[in-house]
Amino acid sequence: MKELSSVSNPIVKAAAELKQKKYRTEQQAFLVEGMRSVEEAVNCGIVKQLFVLKGTKTASVRQAAIIAAAAAEGVELYEVTEPVMKKIADTETPQALTAVVARQSAALEE
């Protein structure tokens, strides 16, 4: 797991841009926050990057299992500081897990 501590890191900036529709459309990705939502995304195999708040990766058995499952799928894992998580997250009080998820498009049958 790589450690990110700078809010000016290009990876952090790219993730933070996903708060805006323009960048979500451009990158075909969006942010998911919180243990349950991230867990569902990992189980679906659509997570590109997983950001874990520093000092919380073993906070619970469930969280450790989510991180292990993401690692097994080859997801890019980052341990981030609180200022970095605040920059990435869209909520006022960020969760311990935030993920960049690939946007799936479904074709409608005519």
Regions found by a protein language model. Give the residues of each.
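N-terminal positively charged helical leader segments and presequences
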Residues: 1-90
